[in-house]
Amino acid sequence: KLVALYQKEMSYAGEIVPLSELFFRDEQILGDDEQEVINGEQVPELMNHLYGKLEVLEPFEAAEIKKTIKEVQKETGIKGKQLFMPIRVAVTGQMHGPELPNTIEVLGREKVLSRLKKYV
């Protein structure tokens, strides 16, 4: 699944190592842009809603994760970049990357919840 996430970005298999670093790091190192995103006033409410839903989500798969993010959008009224960017930064430490629901699935529930909890 990990290789499939980055298939379009890779020319050869060895490129997977730097691309997939976020999956193996315990601590996120945020740059100024990422820090600005994660400091948004909507972030605690957003992370709290998402954390609660992902904690009990079954099955923990991309399609269900995508639906869950949509539910959080409806419940909080937070949408667009205000919704997706803080989730991406909290979960990956990056502003860009592969499809967010797929990334969340591959990271796994435990790692995702641990990362979200820092911003609740």
Swiss-Prot record:
Top-level lineage group: Bacteria
Enzyme class: ligase
Chemical reaction(s) catalysed: tRNA(Glu) + L-glutamate + ATP = L-glutamyl-tRNA(Glu) + AMP + diphosphate
Function: Catalyzes the attachment of glutamate to tRNA(Glu) in a two-step reaction: glutamate is first activated by ATP to form Glu-AMP and then transferred to the acceptor end of tRNA(Glu).
Originating organism: Staphylococcus xylosus
A molecular-function term among this protein's GO annotations: tRNA binding
PANTHER family: GLUTAMATE--TRNA LIGASE, GLUTAMATE--TRNA LIGASE, MITOCHONDRIAL-RELATED
Biological process annotations from GO: glutamyl-tRNA aminoacylation
UniProt cross-references to InterPro entries, sorted A to Z: aa-tRNA-synth_I_cd-bd, aa-tRNA-synth_I_codon-bd_sub2, aa_tRNA-synth_I_cd-bd_sf, GluQ/Sye
Annotated keywords: Aminoacyl-tRNA synthetase, ATP-binding, Cytoplasm, Ligase, Nucleotide-binding, Protein biosynthesis
Family matches, as Gene3D superfamilies: 1.10.10.350
Similarity comment: Belongs to the class-I aminoacyl-tRNA synthetase family. Glutamate--tRNA ligase type 1 subfamily.
Gene behind the chain: gltX
Positions of transmembrane segments: none
Protein name in UniProt: Glutamate--tRNA ligase
Lineage of the organism: Bacteria, Bacillati, Bacillota, Bacilli, Bacillales
Subcellular location(s) per record: Cytoplasm
Primary localization class, coarse: cytoplasm
GO cellular component, as recorded: cytosol
Subunit structure, as described in the record: Monomer.
EC number(s) stated in the UniProt entry for this protein: 6.1.1.17
